[in-house]
Regions:
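Paired acidic/hydrophobic, glycine-rich loop segments that form the ligand-binding mouth/hinge
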Residues: 73-78, 248-253, 269
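Short helix-initiation/N-cap motifs at beta->coil->alpha
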Residues: 63-70, 157-163, 230-243
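Conserved N-terminal structural module of periplasmic/extracytoplasmic solute-binding proteins
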Residues: 22-90, 100-107, 152, 236, ...
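Glycine-centered hinge/linker elements that transmit conformational signals in sensory
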Residues: 163-168, 203-233
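Long, aromatic- and glycine/proline-rich binding clefts that accommodate carbohydrate-like moieties
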Residues: 325-343
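Hinge/lid segment of periplasmic solute-binding proteins
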Residues: 81-137, 163, 269-271
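Extracytoplasmic/periplasmic substrate-recognition and gating elements
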Residues: 53-54, 148, 223, 229, ...
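Short, solvent-exposed loop/beta-turn-alpha elements that line the ligand-binding surface or hinge
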Residues: 96-111, 155, 177, 196-215, ...
Length: 343
């Protein structure tokens, strides 16, 4: 009787064992916290799906960040949030340490210098990855340029050329020859950097009242009175106006290129931010803003290994080129930038 009770159990175990051994282990889940708008989240989701399909050990999931929640495995942080994240170092694990412990190659020195600002220590080691940074550029409405007798393949390079273009657009009937999004970022921070003007003194005190800044602000005031420059708000309100075909020229984030290109409502031309050709040494370089990727502290070793693999995936030049093309973000390495420039 005792034997009869044991045999069915043994048989069941024997039958189940081969099938259980065939069952693949579930992938380790890596949460990526973000506060992106729906459109940008969809773009990032496509990139994540590609990583997930290339290997079976890890599954990255995009989750919306809730205020007060502890950091996730991966955290997409804006420039505005960055100071708070740097201050709360105990909540995050330095990226260079994650890569070293996972024995994954990672050379921070290969990343463009302007992208590493504020994300590393004195030794050049990175705390986070500058994955989603953008810079201000000039967008033009090619149809509006053609209507005004302007060459749509030759966007203005200087503010003097911008004035001539705005004048012709206005004469051609445009009610919005030129507009801008993010005015303080474009017309203070980047105007100063692009034209080689300091925005703070040796003690770190802000100084926006230099000759170039005052002259530029006065110029925009004159343009506004002449209806050459139309102001829609201090954030990205002007983006929608340009996307709807209302404006001939727009200065805004390079990350707008993807949505504009995909909407196909406006045939768009893109050029560098205009500079003042009467300022010695101009142009120099614009400033990068946008998103960086931070790693949460207190995660499991297997999760950190997956994070390192995901970061290596993001560093691939071909992927950077593609992401730059669809999202307008800056390629992180000179090699990727060279590849992007050849396409």
């Amino acid at each position: 009787m005792h034997l009869l009770r044991i045999l069915p159990a043994a048989l069941a175990f024997a039958l189940a064992a081969p099938f259980s051994s065939l069952t693949a282990a579930a992938p380790t889940t890596l949460d990526l916290s973000h506060q992106l708008d729906e459109e940008r989240a969809e773009r990032l989701e496509k990139l994540i799906e590609r990583f997930n399909s290339r290997q079976k050990d890890y599954e990255v999931k995009l989750v919306r960040r809730v205020q007060g929640d502890p950091p996730k495995d991966l955290n997409l942080v804006t420039r505005e949030e960055q100071a708070r994240f740097v201050a709360a170092k105990a909540n995050f694990k330095p990226l260079h340490q994650v890569m070293k412990e996972a024995n994954m190659p990672f050379e921070a020195g290969k990343l463009a210098p302007e992208l590493r600002v504020g994300l590393g220590d004195a030794k050049g080691e990175l705390f986070a990855l500058p994955i989603g940074l953008s810079t201000p550029v000039l967008f033009i409405n090619k149809a509006a340029f053609s209507k005004a007798g302007l060459d749509p393949e030759k966007p203005p390079k200087t503010w003097a050329e911008m004035l001539k273009a705005a004048d012709k657009l206005f004469d051609a009937g445009s009610t919005c020859p030129y507009t801008t999004s993010w005015p303080s970022w474009v017309h203070i921070d980047n105007l100063s950097s692009w034209n080689g003007v300091e925005v703070s003194d040796a003690k770190g005190r802000l100084n926006f009242n230099g000759l170039v800044q005052v002259k530029h602000t006065a110029m925009l005031t004159t343009w506004a009175k002449a209806r050459f420059f139309i102001y829609f708000g201090r954030r990205d309100e002007a983006d929608n106006r340009f996307a709807a075909g209302e404006c001939g020229m727009l200065t805004s984030s390079s990350s707008l290129y993807g949505p504009l290109h995909e909407s196909r409502k406006v045939e768009v031309g893109v050029s560098s931010l205009p500079y003042h050709d009467d300022v010695p040494g101009a142009p120099q370089q614009t400033m990068a803003g946008g998103y960086s990727l931070w790693v949460g502290a207190g995660q499991k070793p297997a999760e950190y290994k997956g994070v390192a693999q995901f970061v290596s995936f993001l560093m691939e030049p071909d992927l950077q080129v593609e992401f730059s093309a669809v999202a307008g973000f800056l390629p992180m390495t000179p090699a990727a930038r060279a590849a992007a420039g050849s396409k």
